[in-house]
Swiss-Prot record:
Name of the molecule in the record: Adenosine deaminase
Organism lineage string: Bacteria, Bacillati, Bacillota, Bacilli, Lactobacillales
EC number(s) reported in the record: 3.5.4.4
Record organism: Streptococcus equi subsp. equi (strain 4047)
Residues involved in substrate binding: H17, D19, G172
Residues binding Zn(2+): H15, H17, H199, D279
CDD domains on file: ADA
Gene behind this protein: add
Catalytic activity: adenosine + H2O + H(+) = inosine + NH4(+); 2'-deoxyadenosine + H2O + H(+) = 2'-deoxyinosine + NH4(+)
Coiled-coil region(s): none
InterPro entries: A_deaminase, A_deaminase_dom, Ado/ade_deaminase, Metal_Hydrolase
């Protein structure tokens, strides 16, 4: 398929980080609001906020986020940022998106976690009204931070549960802070009633995927370490888990050292549920259309495959049952003309 056709395909995205996905124009607006100097030249600014094509590691990749953190410290900035990412998604025919962020990273200048979430939800709502997309929020704890900080944040933001906030996650340094370290807090938070997704297996540790599945988590981000793990793949499928795949990001961070190390084909051939995602649109210099192009190029993914992956994404989403039904109907209708070709 040509790029223009891939762009026209209806899409759903489950794994997109707010602070890693801001457009250059919005970064400039945010910098002006924060009175922070950034390069006026697009190529210079892009170099500042985009990770190298090949990083030394995940931690090397994450350094890029340090540039954005000071720009997301006010309600106005957070609302603008959330609106920007929704707009970007809608313009490439994403009909459903879950945008995740860590309130802790926007609390440097006195905002509370509740204020951070409120501001992000305001931006999501503006984008939904303007573009006809459905956009939800996932709140992340940072793995490397004190568990007490994440515990307090998760508890405090519950007032927004099912008012746009639909789930929780842990992001950050997986290698040193595996699921076992987070297990008790994850169980506590699951008791609140909102679902969990979790970054798992991005650092090359299959056991971290096992631990996440054993916590009853039904959506896992990256799962790169499932590659060539036959028993783990069987467990993944038996537990009805959906993979949130992030191809470009995984190659950058060396989670997958080569295209052959990326687990998509093994997941697909085994009948596992999966979704295709950007992870970080700006940091990885990508969007969903680019990701789809790469899947066509490297894996010969077909329109029928994309339809199936988007069905999986919507079914595994944290949207309400009624929203899922409407989104699935919209998805099927959008693909009818392409499937017939």
């Amino acid at each position: 398929m040509e790029t223009k056709d891939l762009k026209k395909l209806a899409k759903a995205e489950l794994h997109c980080h707010l602070d890693g996905s801001l457009s250059l124009d919005t970064i400039r607006q945010l910098a002006a609001l924060a009175q922070v100097d950034v390069p006026q030249d697009d190529s210079e600014l892009k170099q500042l906020v985009t990770a190298p094509e090949t990083c030394e590691s995940l931690m090397d990749y994450l350094k890029t986020f340090d540039v954005i953190r000071p720009l997301l410290q006010t309600p106005q900035a957070l609302t603008l940022a959330a609106y920007d990412v929704v707009k970007q998604a809608a313009l490439e025919n994403v009909i459903y998106i879950e945008i995740r962020f860590a309130p802790e990273l926007s609390m440097d200048q006195g905002l509370t976690a509740t204020q951070v979430v409120e501001a992000v939800l305001k931006g999501l709502e503006q984008g939904q009204k303007e573009f006809g997309i459905v956009a939800k929020a996932i709140v992340c704890g940072m793995r490397q931070s004190s568990l007490d900080i994440s515990r307090e944040i998760f508890a405090n933001v519950l007032e927004w549960a099912n008012k746009g906030l639909v789930g929780f996650d842990f992001a950050g340094n997986e290698l040193d802070f595996p699921p076992a370290v987070l297990a008790d807090l994850i169980k506590e938070t699951q008791a609140y009633g909102l679902p969990f997704t979790l970054h798992a297996g991005e650092c090359g540790c299959p056991n971290y995927i096992v631990d996440a599945i054993d916590l009853g988590i039904k959506r896992l981000g990256h799962v790169t370490a499932i590659h060539n793990q036959k028993d783990l793949l069987a467990k993944f499928i038996a537990n009805d888990v959906t993979a949130e795949l992030c191809f470009t990001s995984n190659l950058q961070t060396k989670a997958a050292r080569t295209v052959e190390d990326f687990p998509y084909m093994q997941l697909r051939q085994a009948g596992a549920k999966l979704s295709i995602n950007t992870d970080n649109r700006t940091v990885s210099d990508t969007n969903l259309t680019k990701e789809y192009e790469l899947f066509v190029k490297h894996f010969e993914t077909s329109v029928t495959d994309f339809l199936e992956h988007n069905r999986d994404a919507i079914k595994a989403s944290f949207a309400s049952p009624a929203e899922k039904e409407a989104l699935l109907d919209r998805l099927e209708k959008a693909y009818q003309s392409y499937i017939k070709k």
